[in-house]
Each structure stands twice: as C-alpha cells, then as structure tokens.
Amino acid sequence: ETEEAPVIEFLEKRGFSCGVMLSYYLLLALARRGRYESVYRLLLNDSDHGWCNMLREGATTCFEAWGKDQKWNTSLCHPWASAPVPVILEEIAGIHLSPEGGCDFAPHIPKEVDYFHTSVRMRRKTYTVTKQDGKIHAAIDGIEQSKEM
C-alpha cells in the first residue's frame, strides 16, 4: 500500500487531465483504493475538464470531450462520457447486484454530502439509497434493508 500511495496522490492532484474516455478508470481506481471523497470532488469539479463544464456549455447529453471546442469533431452525445452513472451507483451509493439476483449495499457517501438520494430500477426491482440527517438508508422496492450503515 505504501508503494501505491504516491501514485494515488499524483492521480488525485492531476484530476481529469486525461480525456473523458479514461475518466471512468480514474474514478474506479480511486474508489477501489477507498478515496471516495476524491471521486466525489472529481465528479463535481468545476474546471474545463469535467462534467460541470459540459453542463455550463448547455449539455443535455454527455460530450465526447470535456467541452465543445476541445476536439474539432467532437460528438455531443457520446456513451463513454456517461462514466459517472456506474460510479455513482456502484461506488458512491454502493449498490452491488450479484449474478444470483441478490443485492449488497455498501455505500460510500462522503461526509461532506448532507443529502443524497438515488433510486434505480434493475431486475424488476427498485433499489434506493438515501443519506439524510447523517443516516444512510437502503431499500429494495421500498422495504428498508436492516443492514447497519
């Protein structure tokens, strides 16, 4: 772990100096090393290299590049730029479906987040994770899961 610490710190410092396509792998690497606060900060970073820039430029879908003018022939509706979706669902909300049909909840919602709510429909069930008043709740089809979080 001590050998990888400088690499993780370097990645956190550099942020999204990579293209949009590699952003998923950067977010995933940070999450798998327990750096959920960094993942959250990168998701909401306000630089020219982030999804906030796409919103600033009027995006209603994800761009191929971080901004319209950053690539001469950029697509303004590109699937690889949707990296936040699985990262938010799996790493922040912690919704993990098993191949057998079960679900484990392992949320990693940063302390700085006062309110969080996500609900997603998969496998004919609705999975919900909410953080409010400092407490995290998970539910399947509206039934609270008893696991302490």
Write out the residue ranges for each language-model feature.
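Alpha-helix C-terminal capping/termination sites
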Residues: 1, 29-32, 123
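Solvent-exposed loop and edge beta-strand segments that line ligand/cofactor-binding
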Residues: 7-24, 70-80
